[in-house]
């Protein structure tokens, strides 16, 4: 059961199809032998495996530290001009990948709307709106949006085709779309990818920035859950968490590679139709179950 949840997390966290919608169905058919509190904690913490997959796959684009040797002659000249330069040069030699630092600042800027708007209301929204009706409607609505956005996108060329071209203003706008994902069933990756396409990025840039944006957001969510839950676990709970994280990691690697290969030749319409069908199935199943008692 834990392996199944790890597989679902690894797939649905990165494909724009809503992990919540799938987890509702899994929870209906696969009963987990754990407390409600630990299950909620587990479903958040296994996201660490998904985050680690992004870090591993995109290490070269994300890691801002590297050693660049400055010629000795130039180093001596700078050191003679300024006594402080000798100390500063040590830092410059090791930590000088400006483009990657700028990318991280863009990621942090994109996180601002979530921190200011979504985070304070997250528990309230989860309590009031985490039900099959809201999830099903969100699945269908965002499925329709994907189709409409792709139809609109056919008539124009993207203005941002690389992460280097992504401005701070555009990053912030994508961050605003991420706020929408606080509603269960929307999909964090789905809302930010739609946002990225609407503000003029290519599909590849929208997807990659979505992956990178997930690192601080999902890590923060996992850390917050850990603090709330406490740091005391039974050996069985530790094994459950480790298994879920490891499975989510390997499946996420496959899912990310698949998505990036897929969008080079195709648009997101297939995911839109999938969401619509899934939303109808979720709504139909639970209405039928409640009607039949």
Describe the role of every protein-language-model region.
Residues 1-293:
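Multi-pass membrane proteins that catalyze or facilitate reactions on polyprenyl-/lipid-phosphate substrates
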């Amino acid at each position: 059961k834990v392996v199944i949840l790890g597989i679902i997390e690894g797939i649905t966290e990165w494909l724009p199809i809503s992990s919540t919608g799938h987890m509702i169905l899994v929870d209906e058919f696969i009963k987990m032998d754990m407390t409600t509190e630990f299950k909620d904690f587990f479903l958040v913490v296994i996201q660490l495996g998904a985050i680690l997959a992004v870090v591993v796959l995109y290490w070269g684009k994300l890691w801002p530290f590297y050693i660049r040797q400055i010629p000795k002659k130039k180093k001596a000249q700078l050191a003679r001009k300024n006594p402080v330069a000798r100390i500063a040069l040590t830092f410059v030699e090791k930590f000088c990948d400006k483009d990657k630092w700028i990318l991280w600042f863009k990621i942090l800027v994109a996180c601002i709307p979530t921190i200011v708007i979504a985070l304070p209301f997250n528990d309230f929204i989860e309590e009031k709106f985490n039900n099959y009706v809201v999830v099903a409607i969100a699945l269908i609505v965002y499925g329709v949006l994907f189709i409409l956005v792709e139809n609109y996108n056919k008539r124009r060329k993207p203005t941002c085709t690389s992460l280097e071209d992504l401005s701070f203003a555009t990053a912030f706008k994508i961050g605003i779309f991420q706020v929408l994902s606080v509603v269960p069933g929307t999909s964090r990756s789905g809302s930010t990818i739609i946002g990225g396409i609407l503000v003029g990025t290519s599909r590849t840039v929208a997807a990659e920035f979505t992956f990178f944006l997930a690192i601080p957001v999902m890590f923060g969510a996992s850390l917050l859950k850990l603090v709330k839950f406490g740091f005391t676990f039974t050996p069985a709970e530790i094994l459950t968490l480790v298994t879920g994280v490891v499975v989510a990691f390997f499946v996420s690697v496959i899912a990310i590679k698949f998505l990036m290969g897929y969008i080079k030749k195709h648009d997101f319409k297939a995911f839109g139709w999938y969401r619509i069908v899934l939303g109808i199935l979720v709504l139909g199943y639970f209405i039928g179950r409640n009607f039949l008692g």
